Amino acid sequence: MDFTYSITEKEFVEEVRTWLEEHIVGEFVSLRGKGLTGHDDVPAELQIEWEKELAKGGWLGIDFPKSIGGRECSLVEQVLFHKTYVEALAPGRIPNMGVTLLGPTLMAYGTKEQQSRFVPPILSGDELWCQGYSEPDAGSDLSNVHTKAELQGDEWVLNGQKVWTSLAQFADWIFVVARTSKDSKRHSGLSYLLVPMEQPGVSIRPIIQITGG
């Protein structure tokens, strides 16, 4: 098996390396090699700005189709990007749920209208998403979800609580798994709803850690 890189792949690595050198400057220098799990001293706001900087360079969702705003990188190029990123001690990434979870879900199962509405703002860094799966009494067991959604007229009305919604305080949208069938149990009767965070009835509270932080 040949593990040598092609000329195109070497050029790709150089493009990534050069871009990182040119953009990890100014306030982003303080994030170099930081921002990973356990680095509580790194401000999330600055990490979000770094995500937007990556978006300007076209480095968010590099595996997404070009037609929707991605780079359509091959699997090898994706690996090379992350390898080069780590070698450059580039800033630790936020849990970008739009890029890693919602975007791929919409590309696989969403309508063309949903894809064109939601995916480009994710890849441009203009809209940040959080995840609405886990619940206080269910943990991450989605078969035990209690949050309910009822269709009233042309609007869905949600009632419930979600936890571990990382970066909810900064998010523009949340994708929520809720029960839309009245007497459903376990995995049946669940729906996947896209919900704006800025609306009446949505409240966000921090989770107090054992350290008090």
Give the positions of each predicted feature.
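Amphipathic, small/basic residue-rich leader segments at the start of a protein or domain
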Residues: 1-96, 117-124
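Glycine-rich beta->alpha junctions and the first turn(s) of the following alpha-helix
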Residues: 3-5, 11, 201-213
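N-terminal glycine-rich flavin-associated loop
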Residues: 94-113, 139
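A short, Trp-centered hydrophobic/proline-enriched beta-strand micro-motif
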Residues: 125-133
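Glycine-rich phosphate/pyrophosphate-binding beta-alpha loops
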Residues: 138-139, 163-168, 213
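Hydrophobic, small-residue-rich alpha-helical packing segments that form membrane-like cores
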Residues: 140-141, 156
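A structural signal for short hydrophobic beta-strand segments in well-ordered beta-sheet cores
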Residues: 147-150
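A short core secondary-structure module
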Residues: 155, 159-205
